[in-house]
Amino acid sequence: MNKLSRVGIDLAKSVYQLHGVDRSEQTIWRRRLTRGKWLKVLLDTIEPGCEIGMEACAGAHHWARQLQAKGFTVKLIAPQFVKPYVKSNKNDANDAEAICEAMSRPHMRFVAVKTVEQQDIQAVHRIRSGLLSQRTAKANQIRGLVAEYGLVAPQQLASLRAAIPSWLEDAENGLSARFRRLLNDLWDDLKYLDQRITALDQEITTLAQQDPVAQRLQQLRGVGPLIATALVAAVGNAEQFSNGRQMAASLGLTPGQHSSGGK
């Protein structure tokens, strides 16, 4: 077999599809391997200088770090940039071939491999975001339920927190004993979510104090621990961008263009 020049890998939960080409762009290697075997088979097959491409999906940054530690160049591609290179029906084999093709394009944009520290910070933010959604849902559930008993719940979360204890203590507001117990349980749930969010806010503040890049970002007007640490997790090394607009586009801060005709 000729020497592999590029290998595209379609990642999945349990089965990974690999597609390799040589320097003349001829397909010379296709393998479908389980999660426990694919890395060993790949490392036994490829030689130094072979480039490896993957979609920037779940698990991609972990495997990219593993391969980089072995001295290989890994290129992560956003899924929307791989899709145009799928030649026929979507399946694992065609996806791996499309990844292998996309990574060879001279103007392709790649995703920087995140460090473990970046992913730790990202995990904190995602968990916090999920808890905020849960808290909003819990507050809305309380508002909807008490409305059935003739109570008007305030829209502000702080006002709702103040109203719930007064509802529980007011014996003349028409709430049944069973619903008072249920409302008390919901109140406990809401307080627990508040505690979790507060703990994560404190952790984010600590991370922002410890990270030198986050410290520099906080010197900008309007940038606090939340934004600073979120940028560190999302961007990492800003030198990958040639200008600020490129970084803004990668974060989704620039408007998408849907016009035609160069207008």
Residue ranges and their predicted role:
Residues 1-4, 198-223, 231-237:
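Extended, structured, electrostatic nucleic-acid-contact surfaces
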Residues 2-21, 99:
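Gly/Thr-rich phosphate-binding beta-strand-loop-beta motif of the actin/hexokinase/Hsp70
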Residues 12-37:
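Short glycine-rich, Thr/Ser-proximal phosphate-binding strand/loop in the N-terminal lobe
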Residues 34-51:
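Short, basic/hydrophobic alpha-helical segments
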Residues 49-57, 99:
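Acidic beta-strand-to-loop metal/phosphate-binding motif
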Residues 75-123, 164-166, 261-263:
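Short alpha-helix plus adjacent loop in nuclease-associated cores
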Residues 85, 216-263:
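Phosphate-backbone recognition surface of nucleic-acid-processing proteins
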Residues 126-216:
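Glycine-rich, often acidic, oxyanion-interacting loops/wings at catalytic, nucleic-acid
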